[in-house]
Amino acid sequence: IPAHGHTNPTLAVVRELTARGHTVRYYTTEAFRAKVEAAGAVFVPFDTEAARPGMTAADGARLGSDLTFSTKLIVDRTLAADDWLSRDLTVHPPDVIVGDSMAFWAKLAAKKHGIPFVSSTTTFAFNRFSAKVIGQNGAGFLQFLLAQPRINRQLKRLRAAGYAVKSVFDIIANDNETETVVYT
């Protein structure tokens, strides 16, 4: 995620990995090139339209409250990056993909290509109790149910491109088997 609060916590991990002789390829925007290269990573430009929000303020407000809109945005961004990212992962096959918990494309690419995935969580760790803490209620559940046909249309687009997703939770939630790094 091209944001200081998502990038800065990861730089110490990058420094440690590269100091131990690992190659780290860091996908981000040009604005973060100097930081990731100074930490020892290989900068991989992710300045394509897939990485740019391209949203209005009203769209930004919808992200937290409109699951259908959010799912479409995630699918659009993932599919926009699919060809070049798949080529890059073939040319430079990683042992593992460490992706920001909000960079859903990273998790989806790892799953599609059979690469182990580690979630880098720069906020708090999400688990099965998180929805209760953040205020899921009956109205929210009804909204979720009513949105399912539109969400499923978006998921079909991902499946057509080779992404094995069954539900929106395959995109936005990690299971108990997903390794997670949480920065405190």
Listing of model-derived features with the role each one plays in the protein:
Residues 1-8, 103:
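Substrate-binding/gating loop at the entrance of the active-site cleft, primarily
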Residues 2-5, 15, 94:
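Alpha-helical hinge/cap motifs
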Residues 7-18, 32:
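Short amphipathic alpha-helix
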Residues 22, 27-184:
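Nucleotide-sugar-dependent glycosyltransferase catalytic domains
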